A protein has these predicted regions:
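Conserved N-terminal beta1-alpha1 strand-loop-helix module at the mouth
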Residues: 1-88
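A generic structural signal for well-ordered alpha-helical segments
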Residues: 13, 104-105
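Glycine-rich phosphate-binding active-site loops on the catalytic face of alpha/beta enzymes
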Residues: 88-102
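Conserved small/polar residues in nucleotide/adenosyl-binding loops
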Residues: 107-109
C-alpha cells in the first residue's frame, strides 16, 4: 500500500464489482491461481490473512502477476496492515475499523 500504488475503496469497487476472497495454505498455489483468475478477467484479488502462508502468497502474486491487484483481507491490527503493505498489498479489508489500522492505511494512501 505504497503512496503511488494504493487504491481508494471507490477505485477498487469501480474496477472490480466482484472480488474473490482467497484463502491459500500453500504458496505454490498462489501464482497459478492468480494467473487463472486474471486470465478469466478478475484482477482484484483479496488474499485473507487467515493462514501462515498468506503474506508469502501476497508477495508472490504481487511480484509474479503484475496484472493482478493484490489486497489483504481479514486485516485486524496495525501489524497486519503494515505486513500486508510490505508484502505488496494495494488495498486492505478489515472486519472492523480500529484507529490503529486506519492510521496505517492513511500512511500508505
Amino acid at each position: 500500500m505504497t503512496a503511488q500504488a494504493s487504491l481508494t475503496a471507490l477505485q477498487v469497487m469501480q474496477d472490480a464489482p466482484v472480488i474473490p476472497v482467497i484463502v491459500l495454505n500453500d504458496v505454490r498455489h498462489a501464482v497459478p491461481m492468480a494467473r487463472a483468475l486474471v486470465a478469466g478477467g478478475i484482477r482484484m484479488l483479496e488474499v485473507t490473512l487467515r493462514t501462515p502462508q498468506a503474506l508469502a502468497c501476497m508477495e508472490a502474486i504481487a511480484k509474479e502477476v503484475p496484472q493482478a491487484v493484490v489486497g489483504a483481507g481479514t486485516v485486524r491490527s496495525a501489524a497486519d496492515a503494515q505486513a500486508a503493505a510490505l508484502a505488496g498489498a494495494r488495498f486492505a479489508v478489515s472486519p472492523g475499523y480500529t484507529s490503529a489500522v486506519g492510521q496505517i492505511g492513511r500512511a500508505h494512501v
